[in-house]
Every structure is written in C-alpha cells, then in structure tokens.
Amino acid sequence: GIASNIATENSITSKYDGILEIDELRAVEAVDEVSGKKHLVVVSRLAEMRIVDPNTKIVLLTHNIPYGSKLFFNNGDSIKKGDVIIEWDPFNAVIVSEVSGKIEFESLVENVTYKVESDETTGLKEKIIIESKDKTKAPAAHIVDENGNYLKNYSLPLGAHVVKDNGDVVKAGEVLVKIPRAVGKAGDITGGLPRVTELFEARNPSNPAVVSEIDGEVGFGKIKRGNREIIVTSKTGEVKKYLVALSKQILVQENDYVRAGTPLSDGAITPADILAIKGPTAVQEYIVNEVQD
C-alpha cells in the first residue's frame, strides 16, 4: 500500500510558518492558462527546498523539488501553514521546454519510432514512442527560433506520449512529453517477495538501472550497437561514459547536472552500485525503502 500512496502524491503543502529556502534551482516563468496566475516551472533535477524557522533558523521541512513541477513561491518568501508550495502530475513524468519557440521533431516516423493510440479518457489520438527496429533513428524534439536555429534539444524516451505536433509554437515551461509512471510497485507482500529475496542476497536485479558514479553534466554520445552513450563530465574534468540500451527509458537530458548515485535510466538500482558510490549507510536506507515499497 505504501507505494500507491507515494505514486498519487501531487503537491507539497507547508505544515509550518517559516521562510522558504531553495537550492540548485533552475526554473522558467509560466502562466496558468485557467487562472492567469504566474508560477515557476522547475527544469533542474537537483532542486531542494527547506522551510526554516525565521527566529531559530531550525530547518522544519526539507523536500526534493521534482523536475517539471510548478513552484508557487520564490527563494526567501515567507510561507504560512497550509500554503501549497509545489504541485506536479502524479501520474506522469514530463519533459518540459526550457525555452519558447517552434517544435521540430527528428526521426519521428509512424510505426517505426512511434505508434498512434487513442487516449481512453480524452479520446484524443496520441503519439507513443516505441522501440525501433532501425537503431539509427533516435527520436528527438528540437525547439527552434524564427530563423530555424536550434535553441534546445530533447531526447524522446521509450514509452513517451508526445503531446505536441510538428510545427507547434510552445512557451517556456510547457509540457512536450508525458511518460506514464508505474503506479504502485510490488502491490502486496507476495508480489514483492522475489524483490526482497533479490535485495537480501544482494543479487543484481533483473532490470538494473544505469547509475552515474560522479557529480557532473550530462551529454549524449553516439548510438553504438543498439545502445545510447551517455557521458557525464565533472567540474574537475573527470569523464565517465555509460552505454544504455535503446530499449530502456533514459531519465536525463543533455546538459542536466546530476549527482553521484543518480539513475540515468529506468530500472532497479543495484545495492552494489549504491555501496560503491555512496557507502554502507546509503545501502541500508535503500534496502529499507525498497522492502517497504
């Protein structure tokens, strides 16, 4: 039951009065189409918020700020108990545009790199990225200015639902792609037992995630034999290269900054990876969390 509760959380509401402090934030301004109110859309993956008691400076609450979420306050703002600070889509991971411009798709070919399905709730047709037999095609969305210059590029991961059409004009902060989240993991103890055994025997999971070993900036290399090369470069110039199968969902984009231990692809993180990167305490926390899930 715990996993399904986590999956449907969609906001952070303050339980305290205090001052909001935010670290590592990259965000773009956006306007709510319905209410006309301004908010920020978070485009960094390492942002973290704290609510601090203004008098004692004691930290009352800390929370990661999910990528793609809406942020309704700024760093240093006074927060009242009951204020909704952040909201996100509980059912979909998203890719949002960091810039305004026109969208151009690359390698988006029907029945080769995507299929069309009707959404059950809206009845609208959607383009869903599929595993391509043609390994040279890597679907991507480019945001271009009026002269056709590339402003920003986004890889389209497997299973992504593309919510824009070629040539659409997009504003900074708009959602380009939705990726349905897996709601609930093991479901109950019987479904989760194989995973528990896997954990305690420290076996590597059947579908391991690719994890960055260093803090650094993400870049993409070439496609090699059905794998996408991901290159992480640290501030000191250390470079780590990882190969991710094209059948896996890549969770990062070009120029993202990641910390050691950040998964670059979907799948279960192996206890061995966590031990090597973050040490024994982190492994204990991870095993407890995984068993509870």
Sequence positions of predicted segments:
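Intrinsically disordered, low-complexity regulatory segments
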Residues: 1-293
